[in-house]
Regions:
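Glycine-rich, phosphate-binding/catalytic loops in enzymes
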Residues: 51-53, 111-114, 134-135, 188
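Active-site cofactor/cluster-binding pocket
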Residues: 77-131
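Hydrophobic helix-and-loop "lid/oligomerization" segment in the mid-to-C-terminal part
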Residues: 13-76, 86, 90-92, 175-335
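Short, Lys/Arg-enriched N-terminal segments with co-localized hydrophobic residues
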Residues: 1-17
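Structural signal for conserved beta-strand scaffold positions within catalytic alpha/beta enzyme cores
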Residues: 67, 96, 118, 133-135, ...
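Short alpha-helices
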Residues: 122-189
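Generic enzyme active-site microenvironment
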Residues: 36, 40, 96, 118-119, ...
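Short, hinge-like loop/turn segments at secondary-structure boundaries
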Residues: 82-86, 134-137, 286-287
Length: 335
């Protein structure tokens, strides 16, 4: 006898197989494929983009496959992105990975593509593609690309190069398999790509090794972050601090989980000034209160316990902190 959850799981698996077959069919139909990522990409974003590119290239050598957009300092080591002229787009299949809404897609030329496919593990906020595979049960978009390979490996070829970037994305978006989004499937797929021949130590060095300046900056954070009696922790990082410790906004904002292991804190946030963007990067993390609705209120989005947005100024940051503290207060009342 099938229980409700078993039936639901079976239905989702059948849907996933169906939509994967449709995606594979579209890939076969097009000679040119252009893959886009989101603004300020993280390793999961670049990993799923380049991983899919390498997967398609190895499986269909005659196709022209491009990965477009810009890197952050954190992702440059993962592989080169492509420069594509405007005239290539009108006859191309565009695939958008790890992003749920149009305003966060890097390179607006995605609109010029003949057809569009979306592959994303964030909650659905906007429908804009001809074909959309959106599933929040995956801990990372890289896990979705690995699943795409696993379920269709009779027609697809996974290379060492693809395995390397997919593992990097899976590793970082799960907090080294620590977050509660991790499932048995996540671990199994991590093991599959880990078996491929790439330099694990070199990969870890790019992701986790720190300079003396970096370590001093982390020490400053631990000595100067703020927190409330409701369990909210937060850190404001302005340009003066970035200059003092010789760190980039990319690196600084990536340290948000520095506050994640403090037992007094149930929600933590980083606010990092980015002169290049003219905005303040805002990262939300939680092990209790749901944060993606708060992020959406300020024009952002993401997962239930990991989200972000861009604030226009420090006055907006103050409002976010006030709302977040109230969220923590209400959450504690319900315990």
């Amino acid at each position: 006898m099938l229980l409700y959850n078993d039936k639901r799981k079976l239905i989702m698996e059948e849907f996933t197989q169906m939509i994967q077959k449709e995606i594979l069919k579209k890939i076969k139909e097009y000679d040119t494929i252009i893959i886009h990522h989101h603004v300020n990409p993280d390793p999961d974003c670049i990993g799923s983009q380049l991983g899919l590119k390498y997967l398609i290239q190895a499986s269909f050598p005659d196709k022209k496959v491009y990965a477009v957009g810009t890197h952050t300092e954190r992702t440059k080591f993962m592989g080169e992105l492509d420069v594509v002229s405007d005239e290539v787009f009108p006859e191309a299949l565009v695939i958008i990975v790890d992003v749920g809404d149009t305003k966060r897609i890097d390179d607006e030329r995605f609109k010029l593509g003949k057809e569009m496919i979306k592959i994303d593990h964030h909650p659905l906020t906007e429908t804009f593609c001809n074909l959309e595979w959106v599933d929040t049960s995956y801990a990372a978009c890289c896990e979705m690309i690995i699943d795409f390979y696993v379920q269709n490996q009779d027609e697809l070829i996974l290379t060492n190069e693809a395995a390397r970037v997919l593992y990097a994305g899976l590793l970082t978006d799960t907090g080294r398999f620590y977050y509660n989004s991790v499932t048995e499937r996540t671990l199994r797929y991590g093991a599959i790509v880990y078996e491929y021949d790439f330099d694990k130590l070199e990969l870890y060095s790019h992701l986790y090794f720190r300079s003396v300046d970096d370590l001093k900056f982390v020490g400053y954070i631990m000595n100067n972050f703020e927190y409330t009696e409701n369990g909210l922790g937060y850190m404001r990082i302005n340009q003066e601090l970035l200059d003092k410790f010789n760190v980039s906004p990319d690196y600084a904002s990536g340290l948000v989980n520095t506050l994640g292991n403090l037992k007094e804190i149930i929600m933590w946030m980083f606010f990092t000034e980015d002169k290049g963007l003219g905005k303040i990067r805002t990262s939300f993390r939680s092990r209790g209160p749901i944060v993606n609705k708060l992020a959406a209120k300020y024009g952002g989005g993401g997962h239930m316990w990991a989200s972000g947005t861009l604030a226009d100024n420090w006055e907006t940051v103050d409002k976010i902190i006030k709302d977040a503290d109230e969220l923590c207060k209400e959450f504690k009342k319900g315990l």
